[in-house]
Regions:
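Bacterial N-terminal signal peptides that target proteins for export
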Residues: 2-14
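Thiol/selenol-based redox catalytic cores and closely related redox-interacting motifs
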Residues: 75-168, 172-180
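N-terminal signal peptide c-region/cleavage motif recognized by signal peptidases
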Residues: 22-23
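N-terminal, post-signal-peptide region of Sec/Tat-exported proteins
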Residues: 46-94
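Local sequence-structure signature of Cys/Sec-based thiol-disulfide redox active-site neighborhoods
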Residues: 27-52
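Loop/turn elements at helix/coil->beta-strand transitions in domains of secreted/extracellular proteins
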Residues: 28, 55, 107-109
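Short beta->alpha connector loops
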Residues: 37-38, 62, 116-117
Length: 180
């Protein structure tokens, strides 16, 4: 075996090992979820997380206090708050985005999908609306100060456009908002 081939082979084995370690670290991450005992969509989100390899513990005590302690503002609020590996996760954030967060390890409070958009994990149904997964960089940031971490827009995929084809009235009615 030539040295060049051996080096390429060694790098490949090393990369596969690192990938396996990252997957294993994510798969062994325990998610602590704070929610209302009567919230059905929260239970569906917990199922989504478990289906994606996470260990999940639920605390049916509500999420208002833990949301505040975690540094998530009311403007970014949803029906449940989760804690995983030092990050706060607010609302119906897809498991893939949480895995990406745990892999990239940015300096941040965590992620949020504010309100309860139709089509998010736990909010599945016949209706699917566009939504953003927001990166919360600093405690108590408002919605306008966050960064879009990922965008889910079923309209853009169907039409080939980057803007949703929903009317303004449809967009405004597409989210189940929390009561203050």
């Amino acid at each position: 075996m030539k040295i060049k081939d051996f080096s390429r082979y060694t790098r490949s084995i090393f990369a596969i090992g690192l990938l396996g370690m990252t997957s294993q670290a994510i798969a062994t991450a325990t998610v602590e979820v704070y929610k209302s005992p009567t919230c059905g969509c929260c239970n569906k989100w917990v199922d989504h997380m478990r289906e994606n390899g996470f260990t999940v513990n639920t605390h049916d005590i509500g999420n208002k206090d833990i949301r505040k302690k975690s540094g998530i503002s009311e403007t970014l609020g949803s029906c449940h708050t989760a804690l995983v590996n030092g990050y706060a996760i607010e609302g119906h954030v897809p498991a893939a985005d949480i895995m990406r967060l745990l892999k990239e390890k940015p300096k941040a409070v965590g992620l949020s999908v504010p309100d309860m958009p139709h089509g998010t994990p736990g909010m599945e149904g016949s209706r699917v609306d566009p939504y953003n997964v927001l990166l919360i960089k600093e405690p108590d940031q408002s919605r306008k100060d966050t960064t879009i971490y990922n965008r889910y827009d079923p309209y853009a995929k169907q039409s080939g456009k980057t803007e949703p084809v929903a009317t303004e009235a449809e967009k405004n009615s597409s989210i189940m908002r929390l009561k203050p």
